[in-house]
């Protein structure tokens, strides 16, 4: 990836994470970056191609998250540290989930679930020591994941909130046993 693209991708990624595709205003982003908007069109041609680059960048970031999650030994603090470190990636994924009416977004959400979901589920099952069938664990995780993405925002993705969230999730899961 060329250096000229990286500032656009970094700002675009964060902007998409906060506002979705509708927030990708080229002129406003050019002003923030202090470069001409013609630079954007030189690198990406149009917003659709730019979003494709952002989706690819997101998948690359999720591969890194998956490796880190696979090495985590606990939810608190290890997994929470990872989630805080990759805050913008979670928020980007949240926007994709909210716009699942677009086929390209659905594909990326499904791929990210495969990448990051498995390591997280294994850690969660180990730490909670649940006596659930694999089907029940998968269903509970799916609900928890949807709930998680509905609740997160740029202000609450920090250690305190995440710790409380996972404690509550643990309490709910134990109540279902």
List PLM regions with ranges.
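Short, Lys/Arg-enriched anionic-surface-contact patches
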Residues: 1-5
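Hydrophobic alpha-helical connector segments
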Residues: 53, 64-92
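Alpha-helical DNA-contacting segments of helix-turn-helix folds
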Residues: 44, 50-58, 109-112, 116
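Amphipathic alpha-helical packing segments from all-alpha helical-bundle domains
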Residues: 101-142, 149, 156, 160-170
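Helix-turn-helix
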Residues: 7, 11, 15-49, 53
């Amino acid at each position: 990836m060329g250096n000229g693209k990286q500032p656009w991708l970094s700002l675009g990624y964060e902007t998409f994470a906060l506002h979705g595709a509708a927030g990708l205003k080229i002129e406003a982003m050019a002003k923030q970056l202090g470069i001409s908007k013609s630079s954007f069109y030189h690198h990406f041609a149009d917003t659709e191609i730019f979003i494709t680059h952002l989706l690819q960048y997101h998948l690359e970031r999720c591969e890194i998250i998956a490796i880190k999650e696979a090495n985590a030994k606990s939810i608190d603090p290890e997994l929470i540290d990872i989630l805080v470190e990759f805050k913008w990636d979670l928020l980007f994924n949240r926007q994709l989930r909210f716009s699942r009416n677009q086929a390209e977004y659905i594909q990326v959400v499904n791929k990210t679930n495969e990448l990051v979901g498995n390591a997280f589920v294994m850690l969660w099952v180990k730490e909670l020591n649940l006596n659930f069938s694999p089907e029940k664990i998968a269903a509970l995780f799916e609900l928890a994941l949807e709930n998680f993405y509905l609740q997160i925002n740029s202000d609450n993705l920090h250690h305190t909130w995440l710790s409380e969230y996972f404690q509550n999730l643990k309490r709910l899961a134990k109540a279902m046993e």
